[in-house]
Amino acid sequence: MTKSELMEKLSAKQPTLSAKEIENMVKDILEFISQSLENGDRVEVRGFGSFSLHHRQPRLGRNPKTGDSVNLSAKSVPYFKAGKELKARVDVQA
């Protein structure tokens, strides 16, 4: 689902809110999560999951095009861990 599709579904579910209000709310939520991660904070949405940063150590990588070794510096990457309720909802036993 894209951000636009999410806004359309929210608009259909909440007809009293304008499309612009929904767009602003979705953008604000994503911005708050991004700012928190940028500040090194963890964001937890109970029952859904948590967003945090994982730190990657510097390592020796390889350029896939040339095969040359490349030194990759340390970096932080966003990480999402699903909560118990979300895991239970998507774990459909066939």
From Swiss-Prot:
Any single GO CC term annotated in Swiss-Prot or TrEMBL for this entry: cytosol
Cross-referenced InterPro entries: Hist_DNA-bd (IPR000119), Histone-like_DNA-bd_CS (IPR020816), IHF-like_DNA-bd_dom_sf (IPR010992), IHF_beta (IPR005685)
Record PROSITE patterns: HISTONE_LIKE
Gene Ontology MF term list: DNA binding; structural constituent of chromatin
Function in brief: This protein is one of the two subunits of integration host factor, a specific DNA-binding protein that functions in genetic recombination as well as in transcriptional and translational control.
Entry's family note: Belongs to the bacterial histone-like protein family.
Complex and partners: Heterodimer of an alpha and a beta chain.
Protein name: Integration host factor subunit beta
Protein species of origin: Haemophilus influenzae (strain PittEE)
